Amino acid sequence: MKALEWMGDSLKILDQTRLPVEIKYRMAATYEEVAEAIEKMEVRGAPAIGAAAAYGYALGAIGYSGELAGLSAHMEKVQHRLAETRPTAVNLFWALRRMEDRLRDQHEAKELAEIRQALVAEAESIAEDDRRVNRLIGEHGNAIVTAEANILTHCNAGALATVEYGTALGVIRAAQQAGKKVHVYAGETRPFLQGARLTALELMNDHIPVTLIADNMAGFLMQQGNIDLVIVGADRIAANGDTANKIGTYSLAVLAHAHGIPFYVAAPTSTIDLKVPSGQDIPIEERNPKELREVFGVQVAPPEVPVYNPAFDVTPAKLITGIITEKGIVTSPYSVNLLKMMVRS
């Protein structure tokens, strides 16, 4: 199953809200359809959101039928619509900046067709970069996995969250392919259940041993000595190493620290936002209260109960053992070492 696939004039998006019960695709032919798919979490995961937004931007140009002189104003509208879909995942904004830069490079183009072709090529490049980068993350991350390891992960940072292979699950895949005996504990990840619905499905399809647990069982497993390592993905990493990821990640980091268990973040360098000094400056998306009052249409709480539903939390850098990127593994002091890595790249 691919999270997304370019079909030449539309974007084929796997509707992940239907998994694992049903495999259904959306054929997005306009940028508005791509924006809706991102908002509704049909496509999710920071790298996949970035790639989808890039294709959505290209579709904005493909769908434009006005004069060449009016394209710039139209594409500003397209970019704004895509940018407002999910505020926390920085890959979204990184991809849109790349697309905007490619559009500016076409200022001497005389035909719309030439510009459209260039934008599609840039979106394809972003997608291909993600495939390559995730494999490198896996290669680097394999070094921190012992010959036999029980690994805890949270949410879904696998192939379904990227164009291909995955970040946190990419490390696990690389370890298995290297002949290591890995067993994964997947937290269910309330309220949207990405761990139960997506991570468990991915790992089972790849014949990687996995056990599903409720989110509130992690501490007990650590206390029993059943967790050797925690690996999670990321939606935005601040300049000081503070990391925004799916809600519940911070709790796991605190538990891992209390039990002396290594806690790693796996993410591409496109997730690092040096313009954001610390986690306090990362915008945190708050989602629809219905996601807590209901579970897939079944009411599980009083309909009038007040709800607080942040989609992400921020793990302080001091709780992170290392950040696994395609450039290597970065360790503390993050303010220094992340900057060094980004300057070199």
Curated annotation (Swiss-Prot):
GO biological process per UniProt: L-methionine salvage from methylthioadenosine
Keywords: Amino-acid biosynthesis, Isomerase, Methionine biosynthesis
GO molecular function: S-methyl-5-thioribose-1-phosphate isomerase activity
Active-site residue numbers: D235 (proton donor)
Annotated substrate binding sites: R44, G45, A46, R86, Q194, N245, K246
Pathway(s) per entry: Amino-acid biosynthesis; L-methionine biosynthesis via salvage pathway; L-methionine from S-methyl-5-thio-alpha-D-ribose 1-phosphate: step 1/6
Enzyme class, spelled out: isomerase
EC number: 5.3.1.23
Site entry: Transition state stabilizer: C155
Keyword Isomerase appears in the UniProt entry: yes
Catalytic reactions of this protein: 5-(methylsulfanyl)-alpha-D-ribose 1-phosphate = 5-(methylsulfanyl)-D-ribulose 1-phosphate
InterPro entries assigned to the protein according to its UniProt record, in alphabetical order: IF-2B-related (IPR000649), IF-M1Pi (IPR005251), IF_2B-like_C (IPR042529), Initiation_fac_2B_a/b/d (IPR011559), M1Pi_N (IPR027363), NagB/RpiA_transferase-like (IPR037171)
SUPFAM superfamilies associated with the record: NagB/RpiA/CoA transferase-like (SSF100950)
Superkingdom of source: Bacteria
Function: Catalyzes the interconversion of methylthioribose-1-phosphate (MTR-1-P) into methylthioribulose-1-phosphate (MTRu-1-P).
Similarity-based family: Belongs to the eIF-2B alpha/beta/delta subunits family. MtnA subfamily.
Protein name: Methylthioribose-1-phosphate isomerase
Phylogenetic lineage: Bacteria, Bacillati, Bacillota, Clostridia, Eubacteriales
